[in-house]
A protein has these predicted regions:
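Leloir-type glycosyltransferase catalytic cores
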Residues: 74-114, 227-275
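A donor-sugar binding/catalytic signature common to diverse glycosyltransferases
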Residues: 185-230
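Short loop/turn segments at strand-loop or loop-helix junctions that form parts
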Residues: 32-35, 63-67, 113-127, 159-161, ...
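Short, well-ordered secondary-structure micro-motifs within conserved domains or adaptor modules
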Residues: 15-50, 54-64, 197-201
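Catalytic donor nucleotide-activated moiety binding site of glycosyltransferases and closely related
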Residues: 141-184
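Well-ordered, non-membrane alpha-helical segments in soluble/globular domains
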Residues: 1-4, 46, 133-147
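Phosphate/adenylate-binding glycine loop and adjacent helical scaffold
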Residues: 42-44, 66-77
Length: 275
């Protein structure tokens, strides 16, 4: 990431800065997600990055762990924040070459299924970035009660694999909902097997469910699967099953290898289509 910045913008124009020291004005903010690291240092750094994005008003480039649509994915998932809004890829039609090279199998849209699968977020700050007025746990309880009330079939609650504290607290009230059970599967795809649809806040698992052909609902309004997944629960009985090729072609431009980042291919794309 640092080598990309220096090679792209020149050493004299780049400052490596610890955002925990406080806000510092910049033209382009480049940061890296903390991934699976749950240490206090990593969490405070990620929270500082989020605050910096909001205060700076600058264009931001965010490097994250890949969204694994195939088993071997040695690339970074990169998105942008511009004017306070997350940008995953441009609105224009994109070439199919990058997505085709991934080699992921696209499954037909599912027409059946036994239950609704709800994939929970990691409630520990700063992983849960929402603009809701309520604290995460209260928001989550209210949402699950709403979902339980409108669902016409059973609901399977999949705990977030890295949300130990939030999972324990939320699961304490789930037994009071007669149509909700808790998954014990480690593998996400095991929970996909009998699901008629997937619901998540803004987890990247919505990408995997779209590829697997499972109708998907996302609660966040700034989500990557916009256009293929419905937002909210209003049309829970009318999921989208649209053509996916255009969206997948665009998604191919979200993940970049280290070589592509360092040698300028990624920046030429970003400069032309994003900035």
């Amino acid at each position: 990431m640092e080598s990309f910045a220096i090679k792209t913008f020149g050493k004299k124009n780049v400052e490596v800065y610890d955002a925990r020291k406080g806000y510092k004005k910049c033209d382009i903010l480049i940061s890296k997600g903390v991934g699976h690291n749950r240490s206090a240092s990593a969490l405070s750094l990620s929270a500082a990055h989020s605050k910096h994005h909001k205060l700076s008003g600058s264009k931001s480039i965010i490097f994250n762990k890949p969204i694994k649509v195939v088993e071997k994915m040695n690339k970074s998932f990169i998105f942008f924040i511009i004017d306070g809004k997350r940008i995953y890829f441009p609105d224009e039609k994109m070439n199919s070459d990058r997505w085709s090279s991934v080699g992921a199998k696209i499954e037909p849209w599912r027409k059946g299924g036994q239950h609704i699968l709800y994939c929970a977020q990691n409630g520990r700050p700063p992983f849960f970035h929402i603009n809701e007025e309520l604290p995460y746990f209260q928001w989550q309880e209210n949402f699950l009660k709403e979902l339980s009330g409108v669902a016409k079939c059973d609901i399977v609650y999949r705990p977030h694999p890295r949300g130990r504290l939030s999972n324990k607290k939320i699961q304490s009230f789930l037994p009071s909902m007669g149509n909700v059970t808790i998954s014990t599967n480690d593998n996400l795809y095991d929970d996909f097997l009998d699901a008629k649809c997937i619901i998540t806040y803004n987890s990247t698992c919505s990408v995997n469910s779209i590829i697997k052909g499972i109708p998907t609902f996302v609660i966040d309004k700034d989500y990557i699967t916009r256009g293929l997944a419905r937002n909210g629960l209003k049309f829970i009985e009318k999921p989208l099953t649209l053509k996916r090729s255009g969206w997948l072609n665009s998604f191919g431009y979200c993940q970049w290898s280290e070589e592509e980042v360092v040698n300028g291919i990624f920046w030429r794309y970003a400069k032309k289509h994003i900035f």
